[in-house]
Every structure is written in C-alpha cells, then in structure tokens.
Amino acid sequence: MTPFPNTCRSVQTVSSSNTVSMGFSINDACPKTLTAEAPINHSKVEIGEAKKPIGTATQTSPVYSWLVLKEPNGVTSSSPFSLFIPTIPATTRTITKSSNKFVNNV
C-alpha cells in the first residue's frame, strides 16, 4: 500500500474499463467535489496508511478517502467515507517514545 503525501493531490489510474482509482491522505483538506478526467462507471478507492499514535501499534485508526462517482447526467461527485485498518496482534511490535522506532516484542 502506498501512503499519500500530506497535500490535496489525487492519485488517478484509468484502466481500459474507465475505472478511475483515486486516493487521498488522512490529513488532506480536500474539496467536497472533484472533476474527473475520464468517464467513470464505478470507482476503486485506494486507501492510505493511518498514522498511529506513539505507544502500541495495536490501535485501529480510520482512513478517510473520497469515493468519486460520475452520474448518468455527467455530473461528477465525491463523498468522504471511513474505513478501518485491522488490529495488529498485541505481541507483534511497539513504537518507543524516545527513538520512534519499532521494536519486536518477544
């Protein structure tokens, strides 16, 4: 999974079936509507990785993206929605406050 930059830039990939893949970072301040460059029948939304707080890496965090759809009348609209990253088992890794590096738990 590729994390997105902390700017309001979209990542678009258009396939032969006119599917556009767009994604945004959790910190983006994006407009509510975006203009698509190609016809969209349906969309696949790419999700960026959530930034976890200092402490254990077991907490889930919502990742916000915008689902972009082209309506039959030609209007392109987008709406925010939230997905959750699955919980990492508690015995895998923790991040230390002093070094901000992951260490393996045994």
Swiss-Prot record:
It comes from the Eukaryota. Almost completely overlaps YIP3. This is Putative uncharacterized protein YNL043C. It comes from Saccharomyces cerevisiae (strain ATCC 204508 / S288c).
